[in-house]
């Protein structure tokens, strides 16, 4: 039988909810076979991050040139910085039968939903907004004003939860990782994803 086309897995949620931490734990698991689509951003690199591994870090001018060339599946400006997902890698990798994993902002996920309605959308939620504030403060990288801005934005993003297929609460990183892996496995077993393949098998058997 032909290889099944890869699944586009979209993980997003409020800033500070732990998207990057959960994504890293998923890809540290030897059983993970997803391909990670690295996003581009104009924000400053944080301690421990590596260009071309965590993000492609670009200047604002360089990013805007790529926007004009229509090189993104999605892009968004969030708290003064651009974030975007390069388009060609995602399409090529899915056509090869690989699942592609995107870790993006909520505004970007809305754009992906329009272009890839069959993608799998997972919202990573904090146990509470107070818990989210503690995480942001614990980073020690932003002012109180910036943190409050992110909390205000998080309230709006939680209200957009209905755009997603699944919600995973990040109360513990290992549990969140396991839940996401189970969701992806179940998604591959959906009747609408495998039906065409088996119909083709039946037709070929009748020849």
UniProtKB/Swiss-Prot annotation:
PROSITE patterns: GUANYLATE_KINASE_1 (PS00856), GUANYLATE_KINASE_2 (PS50052). GO terms for cellular component: cytosol. Its EC number is 2.7.4.8. It is an enzyme of class 2 (transferase). Residues 6-185 form the Guanylate kinase-like domain. InterPro entries: GK/Ca_channel_bsu, Guanylate_kin-like_dom, Guanylate_kinase, Guanylate_kinase_CS, P-loop_NTPase. It holds the Pfam family Guanylate_kin. Belongs to the guanylate kinase family. This is Guanylate kinase. It comes from Staphylococcus aureus (strain bovine RF122 / ET3-1). The gene is gmk.
